[in-house]
Design a protein with these regions (language model features):
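Polybasic, low-complexity binding patches
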Residues: 22-25, 45-83
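Immediate flanking context of iron-sulfur cluster ligation sites
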Residues: 1-38, 45-53
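Generic detection of intrinsically disordered/low-complexity segments and helix-coil linkers/edges
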Residues: 13, 42, 48-51, 77, ...
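Exposed alpha-helical structural elements
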Residues: 29, 64-67, 105-108
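Short flanking/linker segments adjacent to small metal-binding domains or redox-active Cys/His motifs
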Residues: 73-125
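Short C-terminal domain-edge/linker segments immediately following a structured domain
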Residues: 42, 66-68, 88-90
Length: 125
């Protein structure tokens, strides 16, 4: 049975195969879709409740979930929602940090390229 929240997921608008890459990188664009999704917390919660072994759920790959599921299972039921909500927030922060690092790298490359072009101009004059 598909939960009602699943219909509101961003993942419904893209190829389902993207969520089941064998070795996804945290730099993979699908993680960004997850952390911006309106049902990220519900998705992440279900993946922990069901101990999903495959795929990206709520912005987290299977290998990451695998090591956290035992911690989740040890939590009392009344603490699990808060734990999942905090985990989702950390994933959103991680995504923002990854994007900031990519932007900083891009800006450094642009600056180096400009400096190289200037050097080429002054050297050929």
């Amino acid at each position: 049975m598909i939960p009602e929240w699943h219909e509101r997921g961003t993942c419904r608008q893209v190829d389902p195969e993207l969520w089941f890459e064998a070795y996804p990188s945290k730099y993979d664009p699908v993680f960004r879709l997850c952390v911006e999704c309106p049902v990220q917390v519900e998705c992440l919660r279900q993946s922990f409740d069901d101990a999903e072994e495959f795929g990206i759920w709520g912005g987290m790959g299977a290998h990451e979930r695998e090591r956290l599921i035992p911690k989740f299972r040890k939590k009392p039921y009344y603490e699990r929602d808060t734990w999942i909500t905090n985990l989702a927030a950390r994933l959103r922060n991680r995504d923002a940090e990854v994007r900031a690092r990519k932007e900083a790298t891009y800006q450094r490359q642009l600056a180096a390229n400009r400096a190289w072009k200037e050097e080429q101009k002054s050297g050929s004059a």
